[in-house]
């Protein structure tokens, strides 16, 4: 409900009450007594608490005077009061004073506030049926039969619900409850029962008994890192706790205190405004109502005159909750008495046990009353007389003082109304002009020592990506900082006992405010500290030295096809040639007349002899002609299929040849994490107590579990830091598992190292803060702003870009060297040598036959043939003559020449002359 609506409703109630009084009760005012008496019993004690008791008495007088001056409430009637003072815990004296006031004819008794005294007075009022007005919290058992009372203090069950709703709104998962006395356990029973219904862990502690020194307890909570604490105590004790917490160094932004007292607004909180502590409380005084503010100001003026010196720890002239409740109680009694003008008041005697005749009627009027007072809406439960319907303001300490941040009511629950004060695009309220301690670790290129000829001090000693990021954040948020290296040089990991080390421990112990480093955001770390949004995303990968390029073989031209394919091609060649030979012998269309000029010749010839069939297949495979063309359909089908086969094979070979001969293949023994896990020759590991090690340690994937088992079984597999791991990778057969961003930086500067495979996982680097730190959200907003402005990318380019490695020769196609295709020259040379040897064999074989035919010596025949061959100008020679000449007009029988003909000659000349054997 908004403040203007509450103010309007307050004015409506006030005017409505006045209207009722004027319209209905004034005509009957003649029957009213001219004087109405009420009684007030207040505890009094010597010492520093006397001023508080006097404040209640002052409020009693103050409210009566206000009513008497406002003639619309009790026209023609004067409200008088009787005040009695008693000592603390003196119930006998309280009983006696109550009887004295009843004898005076009071219509109601207000107070006392202390438990045993309250019970004594309540018993008397219940017996004589006189309303008893209570103003302090009091436990009422379920079997309580007292009905002549109302309590203006909010019901404890509702207050406990309000505290629980606030804790849930703050998303607390753990808290410490500190109570003053045993009644606190009753008041906070809803909160104490929360762990059984909600995911909240509570630790219960009690303040020291009979002592105001809470420092031992505060020290114990500080040592136990209990940062979220709920104090159930009086405002006096709250003031002492705040002072002692300040002395203990606990008034920082990491602590959040909730005080259940409704008088937190009355404390002097000036010393804590700029401490950054999170201080939250409740307020029932409706200061948003202008009418209430006017009454409070009038009270302050009179209070300062009556008591110039305020109680220690309180603001001067402030109206406490008890005083406001007493003010409202007096007004309610006056208004209710106005509604019953025919009542008469008698003097009552305690020893006679004779009740007031109109007491029950008057008590019902009070329980049915509705009033908008200083403490907001006042409505009583008609059965119990408790105040169960009310509004509570949620107040929080800011740099400008206490501010209202929300409203709670039993019907509507908690409604947070705080609006962040934005100054442009950045929210910098709690970081401006603050000095923060920043912990970090040396890690290139994130944090490095700056190289300089002169000695550097402070933050000037460092440079790197994280240092630039820290400068940008400080510029946006307006804070200053001091950089400190973590003592153990570790990022932060949890041991088997649950203890942390490294930067995480520094944040947990509040030795640092921020951890600005390549700190990986993990689930385990999130349970101990808070993280901002990631400023860089990455993943785990493998760093390994570059493999050496393989020396190419002179027979590299065979690599495009596997040995199996080469064998299959050879078998296909042999098979097709043989099938072609057989089919050609069977097909009648492959036989033709060898002598078309001789019609009577009975000799036919077939071109596809076995050798010619092999020659046809070889010519097709080599994409060359053989001058042998199939004539039959069957042989043409074989030829066509073979040509298609050779087309695909040669095209595939040609396409793959370029890749194999122009790109030098880099053979690495590992290509992925699976390859690492399957072997034991190459040792691998990670930085000890780092996020990468934790990833493998906590992983449930079988491959990573196997890798962690290998690393944990060999202590030498884990290195102390990245530098040690890099050096080991260069000098030994070792692979380092690390973040991809670091690998990218290293490989830009060391050309002997490379990244193997892709990313094993995906994660991010974030800025760490202590759990519950108010700086986290503001740093996150600043990081998002830097990301939108592309400054994060610019900073990464600045620190990651190195001189770079020279372009590798295998990145582009280059001229082929003899080492890659020298084998083809060897094959050519071998073919030439083979052809020479075959030619020599043919030469010797033919000349031996010629010498026998001509009956000449073999040597002379060889000499003549060599002499003729060396005569390069002559193109013709005489055919060797057999012993017996053949007639010139005889038809040459093809069987004489073993049925042979010259290839490609479909017809022969019919000349009677002899054709030369060697054209």
From Swiss-Prot:
Function: Ionotropic glutamate receptor that functions as a cation-permeable ligand-gated ion channel, gated by L-glutamate and the glutamatergic agonist kainic acid. Binding of the excitatory neurotransmitter L-glutamate induces a conformation change, leading to the opening of the cation channel, and thereby converts the chemical signal to an electrical impulse. The receptor then desensitizes rapidly and enters a transient inactive state, characterized by the presence of bound agonist.
Gene it is expressed from: Grik3
One cellular component term from this protein's GO annotations in UniProt: plasma membrane
Subcellular location: Cell membrane; Postsynaptic cell membrane
UniProt xrefs under Pfam families: ANF_receptor, Lig_chan, Lig_chan-Glu_bd
Disulfide bonds: 99-350
Superkingdom, taxonomy of origin: Eukaryota
UniProt key word Ion transport: yes
Protein species of origin: Mus musculus
Cross-link (Glycyl lysine isopeptide (Lys-Gly) (interchain with G-Cter in SUMO1)): 887
Reactions it catalyzes: Ca(2+)(in) = Ca(2+)(out)
Keyword Cell membrane part of the UniProt annotation: yes
Classification via InterPro entries: ANF_lig-bd_rcpt, Glu/Gly-bd, Iono_Glu_rcpt_met, Ionotropic_Glu_rcpt, Iontro_rcpt_C, Peripla_BP_I
Broad class of the protein's primary localization: membrane
Tissues expressing this chain: Detected in whole brain, cerebellum, brain cortex and hippocampus.
SUPFAM superfamilies: Periplasmic binding protein-like I, Periplasmic binding protein-like II
Lineage, uppermost ranks: Eukaryota, Metazoa, Chordata, Craniata, Vertebrata
Endpoints of the signal sequence: 1-31
Further comment found in the protein's record: The postsynaptic actions of Glu are mediated by a variety of receptors that are named according to their selective agonists. This receptor binds domoate > kainate >> L-glutamate = quisqualate >> AMPA = NMDA.
Residue ranges of the TM segments: 564-584, 637-657, 821-841
UniProt-reported outcome of changing residue 620 to A: Loss of spermine-binding
Assembly with partners or alone: Homotetramer, and heterotetramer with either GRIK4 or GRIK5. Can form functional heteromeric receptors with GRIK2. Interacts with PRKCABP. Interacts with NETO2.
Protein name per its UniProtKB record: Glutamate receptor ionotropic, kainate 3
